[in-house]
Amino acid sequence: MECFKRLTTVFFTVKLVQYLLVYFAPGQFDTSTPLFLEKYQPLQPEKWYHKLLSWDSVYFVKNGLQAVTHTNAYGYVSLPEYEHEWMFSPFVWSQTLKTAGGATLRNWAAPIDTLLVRATLLNLVLHYVSVWLLYALTLRTFPKNRELAYKTSLLFILSSAAGFLLAPYSEPLSFAFSFLGMLLRMLAVEHNVYGGITLAWYNWLPYTLSGICFSVAAANRPNCVLLGVYYIYDVLKLVRQRNWVRAVLFPCIAGSMMLGIFAYMHYYLPSVVFCPERESWCKHSLPWIHIPYKSFYSFVQGYYWRNGFLNYWTWNNVPNFLFALPNLVILWYSTVYFSYQYPLESIRPLVYITRALLLIITFFAHVQIINRISSFIPLHLWYLSDRMIKTTGEAKGDDRLVYLYVNWLILWIPLQTVLFACFLPPA
């Protein structure tokens, strides 16, 4: 009960301070927000919370409004107005915002305000629920270590995503389902002293539900497709143990479900909508099914944002690498720590997932986004918490790194919150 009170108090105190920073922040540098508001709710007065419509949140809210105000195009989903808006969760998060906004939203004089406020409240709830999902996941991973669970949840509240979690970004939905999926899988899988795994038949349901959770997370944020590494790991373990039936009925079913939903969202549906007109994407297709071998998400990222191998490695992007450096370092150190100094077979797949994310973000993407999209991975939070517990006396080596990272967070969270409210980089 004491832990519940402390974490709840910290959570709402941090959020209150952040919203006060947004309130007192000066006007926005960019004109995207006033132009967006002028188009979709003209003659409405400017409000302080319009500052939350910064960067990608403009597109998330627009896609949500599109889902409410337009007729469903394919029976159950409304398509984005422009192709670059497919980047911003046009189905899962947009449909969630549609539900939050309500069917009568199109008749309101200020639909953006209504959607913005409700989506922001929804993200607050998702973040708060995720704090406790992570607490439960930590206790399952490190049994009876309540201090570690408490510190991990505390660090998750003080996330480097900072201001992004105040606005209608799609990250909270993904990390909520990611943590829930990890917890369900951890409840279903037993690890033995020989490095093998055991999957009891009565655990088939929670294991399969983990696949549904990961599918929702990946459909919402494509980087979460890396969670499929859990099922690859389990298949290899079960095949090595010659447990063929369970290999098929547990990880193969859960993983196939996840892969199928991801393929439908990012390959099949865009090919139906854009091919053959979008020749630059459609012409590179698989010969036997006539679907492009490159996901539409990757194509749009490359075409509009110049994502690709080393494309971001230019001198003018050095500041963005500096913004990302603390998380790049701490994520890498966490994989080393849980591979050699504190090896745990149960979190080995998460080590692989973290390393894969680091490689993708460092060499193929806009590197500064690591500060928010790494929020679905708890590995570095466990590393930080464990070292904070074990540190006695003067911090040295890894402990010095942890000390510097926590102090960076204390500086970064208010700074990034104000920058976000002013529509200033980093995005």
From Swiss-Prot:
<feature type="transmembrane region" description="Helical">
    <location>
        <begin position="197"/>
        <end position="217"/>
    </location>
</feature>
<keyword id="KW-1133">Transmembrane helix</keyword>
<feature type="transmembrane region" description="Helical">
    <location>
        <begin position="247"/>
        <end position="267"/>
    </location>
</feature>
<keyword id="KW-0328">Glycosyltransferase</keyword>
<dbReference type="GO" id="GO:0000009">
    <property type="term" value="F:alpha-1,6-mannosyltransferase activity"/>
</dbReference>
<keyword id="KW-0256">Endoplasmic reticulum</keyword>
<feature type="transmembrane region" description="Helical">
    <location>
        <begin position="350"/>
        <end position="370"/>
    </location>
</feature>
<keyword id="KW-0808">Transferase</keyword>
<keyword id="KW-0812">Transmembrane</keyword>
<feature type="transmembrane region" description="Helical">
    <location>
        <begin position="318"/>
        <end position="338"/>
    </location>
</feature>
<feature type="transmembrane region" description="Helical">
    <location>
        <begin position="164"/>
        <end position="184"/>
    </location>
</feature>
<protein>
    <recommendedName>
        <fullName>GPI mannosyltransferase 2</fullName>
        <ecNumber>2.4.1.-</ecNumber>
    </recommendedName>
</protein>
<feature type="transmembrane region" description="Helical">
    <location>
        <begin position="404"/>
        <end position="424"/>
    </location>
</feature>
<dbReference type="GO" id="GO:0005789">
    <property type="term" value="C:endoplasmic reticulum membrane"/>
</dbReference>
<keyword id="KW-0337">GPI-anchor biosynthesis</keyword>
<comment type="pathway">
    <text>Glycolipid biosynthesis; glycosylphosphatidylinositol-anchor biosynthesis.</text>
</comment>
<comment type="function">
    <text>Mannosyltransferase involved in glycosylphosphatidylinositol-anchor biosynthesis. Transfers the second mannose to the glycosylphosphatidylinositol during GPI precursor assembly.</text>
</comment>
<dbReference type="GO" id="GO:0031501">
    <property type="term" value="C:mannosyltransferase complex"/>
</dbReference>
<feature type="transmembrane region" description="Helical">
    <location>
        <begin position="119"/>
        <end position="139"/>
    </location>
</feature>
<dbReference type="GO" id="GO:0000030">
    <property type="term" value="F:mannosyltransferase activity"/>
</dbReference>
<dbReference type="GO" id="GO:0120097">
    <property type="term" value="C:glycosylphosphatidylinositol-mannosyltransferase II complex"/>
</dbReference>
<keyword id="KW-0472">Membrane</keyword>
<feature type="transmembrane region" description="Helical">
    <location>
        <begin position="7"/>
        <end position="27"/>
    </location>
</feature>
<dbReference type="Pfam" id="PF04188">
    <property type="entry name" value="Mannosyl_trans2"/>
</dbReference>
<dbReference type="GO" id="GO:0006506">
    <property type="term" value="P:GPI anchor biosynthetic process"/>
</dbReference>
<dbReference type="GO" id="GO:0004376">
    <property type="term" value="F:glycolipid mannosyltransferase activity"/>
</dbReference>
<dbReference type="InterPro" id="IPR007315">
    <property type="entry name" value="PIG-V/Gpi18"/>
</dbReference>
<comment type="similarity">
    <text>Belongs to the PIGV family.</text>
</comment>
